[in-house]
């Protein structure tokens, strides 16, 4: 897959994001990521055992701690359009 200006513009539209700085650098980084994933697809993993966790017995449990957090507000503050606690995005499916 070739990452170019046309594809980057399409990704911007679908994701409702704007990439304004260093577009050429962004294209180069996306191309590197795609090439890395292609290399991962070439790995022969048929002889490898399927694992869910690298820790024997599973991951240790942790104590849940309740914390006040404004993560929702912080994320929504970055959105170009929002209403209450939701993102407003353009309709892409008819």
Curated annotation (Swiss-Prot):
Enzyme Commission number: 6.3.5.-
Molecular function terms, GO-annotated: asparaginyl-tRNA synthase (glutamine-hydrolyzing) activity; ATP binding; glutaminyl-tRNA synthase (glutamine-hydrolyzing) activity
Keyword Hydrolase recorded: no
Segments forming a coiled coil: none
Record has Magnesium as a keyword: no
Keywords carried by this UniProt record: ATP-binding, Ligase, Nucleotide-binding, Protein biosynthesis
Stored Gene3D superfamilies: Glu-tRNAGln amidotransferase C subunit, N-terminal domain
Assigned protein family: Belongs to the GatC family.
PANTHER family xref list: GLUTAMYL-TRNA(GLN) AMIDOTRANSFERASE SUBUNIT C, MITOCHONDRIAL
Quaternary assembly: Heterotrimer of A, B and C subunits.
Protein name: Aspartyl/glutamyl-tRNA(Asn/Gln) amidotransferase subunit C
Source organism per UniProt: Campylobacter jejuni subsp. doylei (strain ATCC BAA-1458 / RM4099 / 269.97)
Lineage: Bacteria, Pseudomonadati, Campylobacterota, Epsilonproteobacteria, Campylobacterales
